[in-house]
């Protein structure tokens, strides 16, 4: 964890960042959990290539996010929450869900908004919930040769599937996993 005002650590290389933006441009929406928004305040847009930015989706089950989060200033922003969110800008689509709503309910709610493809970018808890529910087609993991803190630890383990490994510039390794089970489209 970093202190307030400290910039996020950069793990991606320029080449892998560009590839990530190309991947983002392929989806209708990009989803993150409230922990990721609170720690990183991501823009969830496409900047490094020419392409359409997906709709940003914040899954904020406990109502921890504020209107100041950068995600809520983006066009088409969506907030899935279990609490009243009258404090968010009127342009933000707020979907109220049960606090224990599973990933299928999230996908169904987004589908009713015309969103047919979702990239789940983080954090670890949200990613794990989609993987455990079988609601994934492909997973992409970038591993940087960096350890943070005294006891660096992996936040997300790889799901089962067909692995493809590629090296990226700067010593990073890209692992792609294809779901061998029933595909969810």
Question: Where in the sequence are the language-model features?
Answer:
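Short, ordered loop/turn segments at secondary-structure junctions
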Residues: 84, 144-145
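Shared catalytic-loop signature of beta/alpha-barrel
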Residues: 138-144, 150-152
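Active-site lining segments that contact anionic ligands and/or coordinate catalytic metals
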Residues: 54, 115-117, 136-138, 170-172
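Small/polar glycine-rich anion-binding or flexible loop at a beta-alpha turn
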Residues: 123-129, 146-147
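Active-site ligand-binding patch in enzyme domains
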Residues: 1-117, 125-128, 184-185
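Short acidic amphipathic segments
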Residues: 126, 130-138
């Amino acid at each position: 964890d970093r202190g307030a005002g400290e910039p996020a650590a950069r793990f991606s290389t320029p080449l892998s960042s560009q590839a990530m933006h190309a991947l983002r441009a392929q989806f209708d929406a990009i989803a993150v959990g409230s922990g990721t928004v609170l720690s990183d305040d991501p823009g969830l847009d496409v900047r490094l290539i020419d392409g359409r930015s997906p709709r940003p989706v914040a899954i904020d089950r406990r109502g921890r996010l504020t209107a100041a989060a950068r995600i809520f200033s983006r066009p088409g922003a969506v907030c899935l929450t279990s609490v009243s969110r009258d404090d968010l800008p009127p342009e933000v689509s707020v979907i109220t869900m049960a606090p224990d709503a599973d990933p299928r309910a999230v996908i169904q709610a987004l589908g009713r908004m015309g969103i047919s493809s979702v990239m789940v970018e983080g954090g670890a808890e949200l990613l794990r919930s989609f993987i455990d529910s079988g609601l994934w087609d492909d997973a992409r993991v970038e591993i940087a040769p960096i350890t943070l803190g005294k006891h660096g630890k992996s936040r997300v383990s790889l799901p089962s599937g067909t692995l493809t490994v590629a090296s990226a510039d700067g010593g990073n390794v890209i692992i792609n996993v294809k779901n061998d089970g029933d595909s969810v489209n």
